[in-house]
Swiss-Prot record:
Signal peptide extent: 1-21
Identification of the protein by name: Fungus-induced protein 1
Domain of life where this protein originates: Eukaryota
Keywords annotated in UniProt: Signal
Length: 63
């Protein structure tokens, strides 16, 4: 039972990181929900240090 709980916790952490753009930045970069809206506030990059997608999709989230 504890093993199942550990696996669920790991999946929750991985999914949270994926939403932030840590693991698969290309999956969510370029959209407003990427990196919790940092790009909407005029920073101009897709996360401002939230992983690999930040500089790559820099111009998309800032406008």
């Amino acid at each position: 039972m504890s093993q199942i709980f550990q696996i669920l916790v790991i999946f929750a952490i991985l999914s949270a990181l994926q939403v932030n753009g840590f693991l698969f930045p290309t999956y969510s970069s370029g959209y407003d929900y990427d990196c919790y809206g940092y790009g909407n506030n005029g920073y101009g990059n897709g996360g401002y240090g939230y992983g690999n997608g930040g500089g790559y999709y820099g111009g998309y989230n800032g406008y």
